[in-house]
Swiss-Prot record:
Recorded catalytic activity of this chain's protein: tRNA(Asn) + L-asparagine + ATP = L-asparaginyl-tRNA(Asn) + AMP + diphosphate + H(+)
CDD domains attached to this UniProt entry: AsxRS_core, EcAsnRS_like_N
Gene3D superfamilies given in the database record: Bira Bifunctional Protein, Domain 2 (3.30.930.10), Nucleic acid-binding proteins (2.40.50.140)
Species: Colwellia psychrerythraea (strain 34H / ATCC BAA-681) (Vibrio psychroerythus)
Gene responsible for this protein: asnS
Protein name: Asparagine--tRNA ligase
Length: 466
């Protein structure tokens, strides 16, 4: 059986005045005094529902049709006709309605036909995609993911599947989730009284990865242009609208490239995926514009049509110190910028995307290339109006002696990075890359204010439901 989607029907891909069968869920039911019921059906394939007009002549009209409520699943067969009413081009004159599943108790069904708060929907994550906003977020998220793959494929990049379990700390921050099969009630100890991870499953300490970057660099040094796109994990106790403990990252890596090359790729990719979502999901984007953020379409078009500003960190500090604005966190050279500083630069000073680059080495990771001044590294963050940092990247340190010095400075064990150091010992090359936080991208494209609302099942401190 070939299942027909509502999006194809509404797009005019089926002939009118002929029989058609669709499947879906009831969004609303409205009954007229003339003995006709109007069913709004949706199947998630697009934002809009299709109307089915059901006459009371059907054998199961009173036993089934009049009992249909929001959320019931049905199979409807009927004649596809042009709709005389406003709002949609087609409707179905039903000749058969088969109920596939009733809602057990309509009075307690959490997704009743009314508007719910974002916070309530977060608590009902297993039912959230049934709502207008949940479905729209999901379709836009899918569109953006497909666009990322399509863009990088068109540029000759290979998608690499990097491991989720690692023995390395890519960021050197130590905020990692441990992976262990040891008995927590009876931990093995070594002669020093410390936990003996030699007895663990992998024979060493292992963690959920904070980034696929180190692993994907190995393939970059063989295939030249690669990327990874998958889940990453941070055991960071941050309860903000911009942080998750589990989130997805897009991480391209380019051989024979410097920081400017990575910034160029990032800018081109952002413009490509935003253009794709505007072209491919106009129904969902119209909903976000109307109900969520009335500036979202202008914001995306602005990114598409604006050249990104390139700004050194040192110059940014000068701007922030002299702008006359009172920040909650004061700035000085050497401190990491907060969201308020990033948003001031992107939203007020430049009113557009900013590539902030060449940061102090002490606030960045060990693998970032040390600049000739000995004080800064070739790192960048892309700041976007409305959200702040959306991309972080760098030119990687390809010189073995400098890499070793940076590992030592940050108190990391060189022995844990032997394979990573091999890349610098066997045909080292300049290479660069960046990481795009995918949930931040989805939030930016939809106008949603919290990344917890753009991932199916958010994982945050004290929350791992579903």
């Amino acid at each position: 059986m070939s299942v027909i989607s509502i999006t194809d029907v509404l797009a005019g891909n089926f002939p009118v005045n002929e029989s058609i069968t669709i499947h879906g869920w009831i969004r609303t039911r409205r009954d007229s005094k003339a003995g006709i019921s109007f069913l709004a059906l949706h199947d998630g394939s697009c934002f809009d529902a299709i109307q089915a007009i059901v006459p009371n002549e059907l054998d199961n009209y009173e036993s089934d049709v009049l009992k249909l409520t929001t959320g019931c699943s049905v199979k409807v067969t009927g004649i596809l006709v042009e709709s005389p009413g406003k709002g949609q081009a087609f409707e179905i004159q039903a000749t058969e309605v088969e109920v596939l599943g009733f809602v057990e108790d309509p009075d307690t069904y959490p997704m009743a036909a009314k508007r719910h708060s974002i916070e309530f929907l977060r608590e009902q994550a297993h039912l959230r995609p049934r709502t207008n906003i949940g479905g729209a977020v999901t379709r836009v998220r899918n569109c953006l993911a497909q666009a990322v793959h399509r863009f990088l494929h068109s540029k000759g990049y290979f998608w690499i599947s990097t491991p989720l379990i690692t023995g390395s700390d890519c960021e050197g921050a130590g905020e990692m989730f441990r992976v262990s099969t040891l008995d927590m009630e009876n931990l093995p100890r070594n002669d020093e009284g410390k936990v003996d991870y030699n007895k663990d499953f992998f024979g060493k300490e292992t963690f959920l990865t904070v980034s696929g970057q180190l692993n994907v660099e190995t393939y970059c040094n063989a295939l030249s242009k690669v990327y990874t796109f998958g889940p990453t994990f941070r055991a960071e106790n941050s309860n903000t609208t911009r942080h998750l403990a589990e989130f997805w990252m897009v991480e391209p890596e380019i051989a024979f490239a410097d920081l400017s090359d990575a910034a160029d790729l990032a800018e081109e990719m952002l413009k490509y995926v935003f253009k794709a979502v505007l072209e491919e999901r106009p129904d969902d984007m119209a909903f976000f514009q109307q109900r969520v953020d009335k500036t979202v379409l202008d914001r995306l078009n602005s990114v598409i049509n604006t050249d990104f500003v390139r700004l050194d960190y040192t110059d940014a500090i000068t701007i922030l110190e002299n702008c006359g604005k009172k920040f909650e966190n004061q700035v000085s050279w050497g401190v990491d910028l907060n969201s308020e500083h990033e948003r001031y630069l992107a939203e007020e000073h430049f009113n557009g995307p900013v590539v902030l680059q060449n940061y102090p080495k002490d606030i960045k990771s060990f693998y970032m290339r040390l600049n000739d001044d000995g004080k800064t590294v070739a790192a960048m963050d892309i700041l976007a109006p409305g959200i702040g940092e959306i991309i972080g990247g760098s030119q990687r340190e390809e010189r073995l002696d400098v890499l070793d010095s940076r590992l030592e400075e940050m108190g990391l064990d060189i022995a844990d990075y032997g394979w990573y150091r091999d890349l610098r010992r066997y045909g080292t090359v300049p290479h660069s890359g960046f990481g795009l936080g995918f949930e931040r991208l989805v939030a930016y494209a939809t106008g949603m204010q919290n990344v917890r609302d753009v991932i199916p099942f958010p994982r945050t401190p004290n929350n791992a439901a579903f």
